A protein has these predicted regions:
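A positional/architectural concept
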Residues: 1-69, 73
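Charged, alpha-helix-enriched surfaces in structured cytosolic catalytic cores
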Residues: 28, 32, 71-74, 86, ...
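Charge-rich, low-complexity linker and terminal segments
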Residues: 1-19, 24, 94-178
Length: 178
């Protein structure tokens, strides 16, 4: 079992249950928040980070739907060079009371989640952190194997495009030779 994460969120937007907005809301990360999010996700820089989200009460749960957009620099998985990248990702989350995700008393129990339960975020008290949930959605939207514009050149220069290379370990050996 892992210890709970006690770090302060890089981008917190607390939404009170008794004050849900009637219309879609736009959340934009400040320069400091973008810098901190970039550090969290191992990105050289985030230039723009925003989400437009609509919230709707469903009993004790709060459904959220919208779109997350971000423009950032990312290291190429092949060359390591930074390149400009972006995401435009739909966001659909349900904020549910934490007691609906009750602890099993320390016993690890394997459960199967339905499609509707996959994006549930538990909250405690009378508020939830929409900003942190959006930041987590961004982290999942980043392609960890993104290839920059120079990836093919680097692969060619290191002999990684040759058919006789013999798989992943041969690719590592080719990189070691250089």
């Amino acid at each position: 079992m892992t210890a709970p994460d006690t770090r302060a969120p890089e981008m917190s937007r607390i939404i009170k249950l008794d004050r849900l907005p009637d219309s879609a809301m736009r959340i934009e990360a400040s320069e400091d928040e973008r810098r901190r999010l970039a550090g969290r996700f191992g990105l050289p820089a985030i230039y723009d980070f925003a989400a437009t989200i609509r919230l709707e009460r469903e009993g004790e749960a709060i459904a959220s739907e919208g779109i997350l957009t971000a423009w950032f620099d990312q290291a190429c998985a092949v060359s390591g060079e930074a390149f400009a990248n972006s995401v435009e990702e739909p966001v659909a989350l349900r904020f549910v009371p934490a007691y609906s995700h009750a602890d099993t008393g320390g016993e690890e129990e394997e459960i199967e989640l339905s499609e509707d339960e996959l994006d549930e975020v538990p909250y405690e008290g009378q508020a939830f952190d929409l900003g942190e949930a959006i930041a987590q959605s961004f982290g999942l939207a980043i392609d960890p194997y993104a290839r920059g514009p120079e990836a093919d050149v680097v692969r060619e220069d290191n002999g990684l495009n040759e058919p006789e290379s013999g798989g992943a370990f041969a690719a590592l050996a080719a990189l070691r030779k250089n």
